[in-house]
Structure formats: structure tokens, C-alpha cells
Design a protein with these regions (language model features):
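Nucleotide/phosphate-binding sheet-loop regions of phosphoryl- and nucleotidyl-transfer enzymes
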Residues: 1-260
Length: 260
């Protein structure tokens, strides 16, 4: 479901808080997703996980915030592990969520999490995140939560409804961030437009070697040429494509040849 730009306007007029009626509407829309997916938000057997993304009228790549795997906590991650019979995937998804949520909503610097991962990989003697197994991510999840406690003096939130409202607030607030303001000024995008928020059931790109994530364009974004263009990563999630930590593959043969 989409929370419209009008709500963004109301959010700022309401001292940067969601109106009470809107919170009820969000809960009702969440129930619709639960019915369609046959999953329940916060459930300990078949948990619904969602993504929370900006929906600005004009694309502002890298300017607005995104949170994936929302709805995971210390209990639902075990339910996800049991449901999918894939412990590594479940723990990898949880650590990603802790990273994104802590950075976007709680304000913990993102590089602090990456440093923990890099140091762990050095200790273990591996190069890639994909070389880490379930027990590795388990240990890093503990380290991540300790980092949040140290930096923000709070425990990482376990209440899934609190997580969702925090993420929606953060996306609205990202419209007013300095980087977004600068981008709008450079690209003549009006400040009063605001952003929408899209809440969607998660589809996973990190469940194994038969899963992937990527971006695609109907035109080449560099040249404007009328040709399909895109790139993807196997066994990854969206942030990996834009973060530059792994080299993506090209979707088309022509792009592969041009890059060679």
C-alpha cells in the first residue's frame, strides 16, 4: 500500500508526527497484506516481513531512505528460519534489517556496522559476505545490537508495530534531509511536493544462488539510448547493488560486451 504525499504534508504540519487516524489506516492496510499473503505481521509461525520505501514523484537515486526485512526480531527470525529451512538466509536478513533500521531510523552511522563485518571477515579469513554462515551472522547480530546500545543507549526495538511506524516516520523525514534538499535544488524539484511511502510484502533476493536483485531501465541512463539496460547481483538484496560492495552483472549480452 502507498501512504500518499498528502500525508507527508500532514506529517510536517503535525510537528513531524503521524496523525492518529493515519496510524489506524496503516494498521487496516497491513491487515489487507496479511490476508493476501496468508502471513501475519509479528507472527511466531509464519511472519509477514515488509519493505518500506520512498515514492517520490521524480526519481532521486540514493537520496531517500529504504528499509528491508521489517518485522524481524529475536523471535520472528527463528520462525523465518523454521519456515524456510534456511538458517543462513534468516540470520542474514535479520542483520541487514538491524543495519538499515539502526542507520535510517535510529541514526547509527552505517560504516560502524560495515567495520564490524570487515573485521569479522578478516578474523575468519574470508573475503565476501556470502562466505559467512548462519553462526557467523548470529555472532554479528549480537555485535550489532551491542553497537546500537552503545551508540544510542537503547535496546534494538523488538515491537514490530513500533518498527513500522519508526520506518514510515524516517522516510518522511528523509525528504527534509540535507542531501535530499541539495539534490532537489540542483535538479529543480519543488520542496512542497513531498514523498509518498510504499509498504510492500518482502520478496527476497538473498535466499540462495537461484535468487537475485537488480535494477532495470527502458533507456540507457548514461547515454539516453533507447535500449534496455540493467544490472543484477545473485544472492543479494537491493542495498548491495547500490552500495558498491559487490560487482553486479549486466542483464544484456550487449552491455557485457561493451564493458569487456
Amino acid at each position: 500500500f502507498t501512504i500518499t504525499t498528502e500525508v507527508c504534508d500532514l506529517f510536517y504540519k503535525n510537528k513531524k508526527k503521524l496523525p492518529a487516524k493515519m496510524i489506524k489506516d496503516i494498521e487496516a492496510e497491513l491487515k489487507n497484506i496479511e490476508k493476501k499473503t496468508k502471513k501475519k505481521f509479528g507472527d511466531l509461525k509464519n511472519p509477514l516481513l515488509v519493505s518500506v520505501r520512498s515514492g517520490a514523484r521524480i526519481s532521486m537515486p540514493g537520496m531517500m531512505d529504504t528499509i528491508l526485512n521489517l518485522g524481524l526480531n529475536d523471535k520472528t527470525v527463528e520462525a523465518l528460519k523454521k519456515k524456510t529451512s534456511n538458517g543462513r538466509f534468516a540470520k542474514d536478513s535479520y542483520r541487514r534489517f538491524i543495519q538499515m533500521y539502526s542507520n535510517v531510523v535510529l541514526g547509527v552511522e552505517g560504516h560502524l556496522f560495515e567495520e564490524l563485518i570487515d573485521n569479522y571477515k578478516l578474523t575468519k579469513g574470508v573475503l565476501l559476505d556470502t562466505d559467512l554462515d548462519e553462526s557467523d551472522w548470529d555472532g554479528l547480530i549480537t555485535n550489532f545490537k551491542e553497537l546500537v546500545k552503545k551508540e544510542k543507549k537503547i535496546n534494538f526495538p523488538q515491537d514490530v508495530k513500533q518498527q513500522l511506524l519508526g520506518a514510515i516516520n524516517a522516510v518522511f523525514l528523509s525528504w527534509d534531509s540535507q542531501r535530499a534538499k541539495t539534490y532537489r535544488k540542483l535538479n529543480q524539484i519543488p520542496d512542497h511536493w513531498g514523498t509518498a511511502v510504499n509498504v510492500q510484502a518482502m520478496v527476497f533476493g538473498n535466499m540462495g544462488s537461484d535468487c537475485s536483485t537488480g535494477v532495470a531501465f527502458t533507456r540507457n541512463p548514461s547515454t539516453g539510448e533507447n535500449s534496455f539496460f540493467g544490472e543484477f547481483l545473485i544472492n543479494a538484496q537491493g542495498e548491495d547493488v547500490v552500495a558498491g560492495t559487490r560487482t553486479p552483472q549486466y542483464i544484456t549480452k550487449k552491455a557485457k560486451q561493451d564493458a569487456a
